[in-house]
């Protein structure tokens, strides 16, 4: 059972460390998003929702995970591998927060995908149809749906793994369909612009701006896919045989990858959005100058 000790040690230290990284990174990104003026309002609101979910992951859920794995490590060091001694209330609270925040992220990313699809498809009509009020209603609906989804996971323990797998599969499918459609629409409009030269300058600029925004959202989705994809087979394998220690290790490792996604998103924002990168540089310089003045 030394494997459990080693895994618990790694996950405890890693979750504590990345909890700090995730929290600081998303606090800086949230500040930058509020100050950014070049990002479309609807995209900004959706990314703010995603960043707040990631902040909740780092500030609460991942920190709790580090504590739980530290407790597991402590009990394992005493040659006690009975994990049922862990407080059920704490475990359920951790799982609830984990699935609430992850469901919110999944639904927000799906919304971003379809928002970008509407943007590249509708062009100038997009602002008329996709209003800030409607985006706000969607974000409230996402919070309520995430709340209910997390409750289902907690109160249906015998089938919660399958619920998680189904939700992930549906999310993967919808986002993939949206981005494939975005690619086709962008390709079609590119051919129009290059072959006809009949589009008005304003419409051409808007099409190019929405195409760039769609590509930026695609990178966020790609990072999400890399971090979440291993979780699906690990859940299925663990559901088939809960007594196999290797399946349990795979599941815990895939959970850490999901947490890692919340640390990587701020990096993607900085990479893909020049204004966010500049605001963050300015903020960090101010913090460093303040630190120098204090010393």
Regions found by a protein language model. Name each.
Residues 107-114, 178-194:
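Membrane-water interface of transmembrane alpha-helices
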Residues 29, 65-68, 146, 150-153, ...:
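Structural signal for membrane-spanning alpha-helices in multi-pass inner-membrane proteins
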Residues 174-175, 223-229, 233-236, 251-295:
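Seventh transmembrane helix
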Residues 1-31, 69, 74, 78, ...:
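Extracellular N-terminal segment of 7TM GPCRs
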Residues 53, 184-233:
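Intracellular effector-coupling site of seven-transmembrane GPCRs
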Residues 100-138:
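Class A GPCR helix-loop hinge within the 7TM core
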Residues 145-184:
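Extracellular-loop-to-transmembrane junctions of the mid-late helices
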Residues 7-16, 43-111:
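Extracellular TM2-ECL1-early TM3 structural module of rhodopsin-like
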């Amino acid at each position: 059972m030394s494997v459990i000790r080693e895994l618990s040690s790694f996950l405890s230290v890693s979750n504590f460390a990345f909890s700090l990284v995730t929290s600081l990174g998303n606090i800086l990104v949230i500040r930058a998003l509020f100050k950014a003026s070049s990002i479309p309002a609807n995209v900004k609101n959706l990314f703010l929702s995603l960043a707040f979910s990631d902040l909740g992951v780092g500030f609460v859920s991942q920190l709790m995970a580090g504590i739980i794995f530290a407790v597991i490590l402590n009990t394992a060091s005493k040659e006690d591998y009975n994990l049922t001694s862990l407080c059920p209330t704490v475990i359920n609270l951790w799982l609830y927060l984990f699935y609430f925040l992850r469901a919110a992220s999944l639904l927000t990313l799906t919304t971003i995908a379809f928002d970008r699809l509407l943007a590249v498809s509708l062009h100038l009509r997009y602002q008329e149809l996709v209003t800030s009020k409607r985006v706000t209603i969607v974000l409230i609906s996402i919070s309520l749906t995430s709340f209910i989804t997390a409750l289902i996971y907690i109160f249906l323990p015998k089938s919660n793994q399958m619920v998680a797998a189904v939700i992930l599969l549906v999310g993967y499918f919808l986002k993939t369909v949206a981005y494939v459609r975005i690619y086709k629409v962008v390709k079609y409009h590119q051919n129009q612009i290059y072959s006809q030269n009949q589009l008005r300058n304003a419409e051409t600029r808007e099409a190019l701006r929405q195409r760039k925004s769609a590509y930026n959202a695609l990178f966020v989705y790609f990072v999400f896919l890399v971090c979440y994809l291993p979780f699906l087979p690990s859940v299925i394998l663990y559901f088939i045989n809960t007594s196999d220690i290797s399946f349990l290790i795979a599941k815990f490792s895939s959970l850490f990858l999901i947490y890692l996604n919340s640390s990587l998103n701020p990096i993607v924002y900085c990479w893909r959005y020049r204004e966010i990168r500049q605001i963050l540089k300015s903020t960090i310089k101010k913090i460093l100058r303040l630190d120098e003045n204090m010393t």
